[in-house]
């Protein structure tokens, strides 16, 4: 009888403990929770009266590093970390360095996303709402409205979850000594 009571107590304890655990994470939630690095080609569409389309490659690494390399229609590189953003425009021989006032780097956005009933993920940071959609278990598109109220849609392809990315690529090193460096 004592053994039976012990078994019942253990089963009740396990049942209560299991009931207190949150629901198991979806595959997408697990990806977001365990994401340490991300690499993908992207297509960025800025929708206004005349839509603008950009193509390039994104490399990002936790906790808050990102490198956006725009290849078309104009070359541009954007380096982000927790302190500043460097926008390098090789055609203009110019790099603009701006202190990062708001935490709106790629990983800050991803870590704050919450799953919605439609399966997408959303978060709002500094009055900007970001919406991420997954496809085949990987981030597929990120939408938001920019500060001029234009809808921006970034579609990812050839996405890699947690690839090895060397830290050095996130540091801006001028390729030409004749460029202007503008600090804002």
Curated annotation (Swiss-Prot):
CDD domains tied to this protein: LolA
Coiled-coil stretches noted in the UniProt entry, renumbered to this chain: none
Entries under Gene3D superfamilies matching the protein: Lipoprotein localisation LolA/LolB/LppX (2.50.20.10)
Domain of life assignment: Bacteria
Secretion signal, residue range per the UniProt entry: 1-19
InterPro entries assigned: LolA/LolB/LppX, OM_lipoprot_carrier_LolA-like, OM_lipoprot_carrier_LolA_Pbac
UniProt keyword list: Chaperone, Periplasm, Protein transport, Signal, Transport
GO process annotations (BP): lipoprotein transport
A Pfam match: LolA
Intracellular or extracellular location(s): Periplasm
Record-level GO cellular component terms: periplasmic space
UniProt similarity note: Belongs to the LolA family.
Cited NCBIfam families: PRK00031.2-1
Free-text function comment from the UniProt entry: Participates in the translocation of lipoproteins from the inner membrane to the outer membrane. Only forms a complex with a lipoprotein if the residue after the N-terminal Cys is not an aspartate (The Asp acts as a targeting signal to indicate that the lipoprotein should stay in the inner membrane).
HAMAP family, sorted: LolA
Complex and partners: Monomer.
Protein name: Outer-membrane lipoprotein carrier protein
Biological classification of the source: Bacteria, Pseudomonadati, Campylobacterota, Epsilonproteobacteria, Campylobacterales
Record gene name: lolA
